[in-house]
Structures are given as structure tokens and as C-alpha cells.
Amino acid sequence: MTVPSTRKDLMIVNMGPHHPSMHGVLRLIVTLDGEDVIDCEPILGYLHRGMEKIAENRTIIQYLPYVTRWDYLATMFTEAITVNAPEQLGNIQVPKRASYIRVIMLELSRIASHLLWLGPFMADIGAQTPFFYIFRERELIYDLFEAATGMRMMHNFFRIGGVAADLPHGWIDKCLDFCDYFLTGIAEYQKLITRNPIFLERVEGVGIIGGEEAINWGLSGPMLRASGIEWDLRKVDHYECYDEFDWEVQWQKEGDSLARYLVRISEMTESIKIIQQALEGIPGGPYENLEIRRFDRVKDTVWNEFDYRFISKKPSPTFELSKQELYARVEAPKGELGIFLIGDKGVFPWRYKIRPPGFINLQILPQLVKRMKLADIMTILGSIDIIMGEVDR
């Protein structure tokens, strides 16, 4: 009697592209042997809009509304890097009050981004309840944004030399109330998620990245800090006024999906600490540098004329970008967000290269999922935290 031989053909499965509200329009071509992942090939570019080329045909002020469409869940950071680069090129000083307002907005945006990472991440691994709790907290942050900027998501709030408007009356008290409330929410998450045995079973020891490996791949943000590298641009580059606050860089040694979760949860607590200190110590003074108007190329300027305030369509000042090159970067929720800017004595940048953290961090995905189970792909992909708007640009 002959025993029938079992076929051992590999199976090729397409995962995605998903809806942008989940993991974005990312397609993974996965080769499987049963449930074991043999190979994984990410296919990018479904959300490519030519953001760098658009930047080279716009002035910096005209380009500001576009940048909120890179990482549309942490728009304050894309605005910050867009104004920081020309500020450094033109040596423009930002008033102390404006710098404090920027830090408050950046840290609120960091919390909102981490919350919107945590909800779908938990849903991916089978926990539906935290998803609704997280949206409850996120709505409160968006209410604060709406009161200060007029918009819930695409804020267009940062300006070269400051911010668009001062904080409205009563906003600081509302924000302090939110900080007190949110600390209890973090404790709730710790109780609900961190010590949950089913959650730990799904994430502990899954997708391990060593410290040296993380550096070699160019990882940044929580991906790097979860691998034992204590690197945070807020401490390294001393931008804005982060040096004036008492806070610690959050990091873990294990390098797995659980470590990346713990880093982000701890970062939210540190962000609240920074916001509370900034709100209590915010100085008076102007919220924008009025001197930047001297950069206006129009010689016969009308900024100071009496009837100017009655003109419905006001011309924006334009800035000559000096003939030099510059790399500016900020610590975004997902990692190092940078811009390589080359000026050419014109109002348009000669080159505008975006360094998105999600694109760099996503490179390690095929290596992480090999020899893992099919169900672990969503755990690992979720722990990387990508937004395809900034990956594809």
C-alpha cells in the first residue's frame, strides 16, 4: 500500500490595501507555508501625491496647508517642521510665548496620535473595548484644538515666527482640567491592557529588534527607544523650549511589540507632565514675531496703512530663501520627521526633501515577520505605527 504524498505548495496571499482609517493603503504580498510566513513584500505608493514636487512650486506660506496631509493624525508636527526650516535659514527668532504655545500643541498632538495608534492596535489583536475608551479621550483633545485653532484635524496653526493666534480666554484652565482627567485615563488603560494575560500572550516576544539592528536600519522614535537606545530629539537638538521643563525620555530594553507599547503609554504621561509645566509657566508677550514682515519682497508694503485692515483679500508676505542648504528635524510621535531644504535666493525652495519616520520604520517589516505566524503580522505592523500619507507622500 502506497501512502499518498502531501502537497507542500506555498500559498501567496494579498493583505490590503486597507481603508486609510485602518493601516492605510498598504498592500502586503505574503508567502505562506501553512500558517508560517516565508516572505513578505510591501507594495507602496497608493497614496502618493507628489508632495515634494508641490513644495518646489509653492512659497513656504502657500505650502503650509498641504503639509497637514502627510501625517494627518499628528498635523502639528508637520506644521512645526515646515516653519522651523525657514526660521533657521532666515535666523528668525520666535517669541517665548509662541514657543510655549507650540510645545503645548505639539504634546497634545503627540497624545492624540498615540491614542489613535493604541485603539486600532488593540482592535487588531482582538480587544474591542479599549477602542471606544480611546476615542472618548481623543475627542477631548480635538475639542481643545478646535477652540484654539478653529479646526479639529488640519489645523494650519503654525506660522513662520510664531503661531496664527493667541490662546483664547479660558483655554488654559480647560487644558489643565483635561490633563488631570487624562492621568486617570492612563491608569485605566494600564489596568485594562498592560496586565491583561491575553494581550501579553499576543505581544510579548513578538517582533524583537535589537539595539544595534535598530540603529543600522535607521529606526527612530518609539521603535528605537523600545530597543534600548535612549534617543529623543527633544533632548538632543534642544529645539523650542523643551529644556525648560522637567521630563524623562521613556525607553525599554526588550525591543518587542510589548516594549513599543510601553514606550508609547509612558510617553503620554510625560507629555501631560510637559503640558502642565508649560501651561503654568507660560509667559506674556506677543504670539508672533512681527519683525518677519521685513522679509517681505514687496517694496511698497501696505502692512501698516490704515485702510489695509478693511481689505478682504490680504496678500501674504513672501520670503526669500537664502542660497544655502539645511536639514531640520523634530521628534514626531512616530519618529524623526525631517526636511532637507535647499534655498536658491528665490521664494520657492530649490529642493524640498521630506524624511518621514513611517517610511524608514516600515523597511524592517519584511525581516520582522519572516518565520512568524500569519496572525503576528497585524501585531507587528500595528506596533510599528505607520500612516500611509507620510510613507507615500
Swiss-Prot record:
Catalysed reaction, written as an equation: a plastoquinone + NADH + (n+1) H(+)(in) = a plastoquinol + NAD(+) + n H(+)(out); a plastoquinone + NADPH + (n+1) H(+)(in) = a plastoquinol + NADP(+) + n H(+)(out)
Superkingdom of this protein's organism: Eukaryota
UniProt-listed SUPFAM superfamilies: HydB/Nqo4-like (SSF56762)
Enzyme Commission number, as recorded: 7.1.1.-
PROSITE patterns given in the database record: COMPLEX1_49K (PS00535)
Subcellular location: Plastid, Chloroplast thylakoid membrane
GO terms of biological process kind: photosynthesis, light reaction
Keyword Methyltransferase among record annotations: no
Keywords: Chloroplast, Membrane, NAD, NADP, Plastid, Plastoquinone, Quinone, Thylakoid, Translocase, Transport
Principal localisation: plastid
GO molecular function, one term: NAD binding
A Gene Ontology term for the protein's cellular component: chloroplast thylakoid membrane
A UniProt-annotated Pfam family: Complex1_49kDa
Membrane association type: Peripheral membrane protein
Subunit structure, interactors included: NDH is composed of at least 16 different subunits, 5 of which are encoded in the nucleus.
The protein's role, per its UniProt record: NDH shuttles electrons from NAD(P)H:plastoquinone, via FMN and iron-sulfur (Fe-S) centers, to quinones in the photosynthetic chain and possibly in a chloroplast respiratory chain. The immediate electron acceptor for the enzyme in this species is believed to be plastoquinone. Couples the redox reaction to proton translocation, and thus conserves the redox energy in a proton gradient.
Family of the protein in this entry: Belongs to the complex I 49 kDa subunit family.
Protein's UniProt name: NAD(P)H-quinone oxidoreductase subunit H, chloroplastic
Upper classification of the organism: Eukaryota, Viridiplantae, Streptophyta, Embryophyta, Tracheophyta
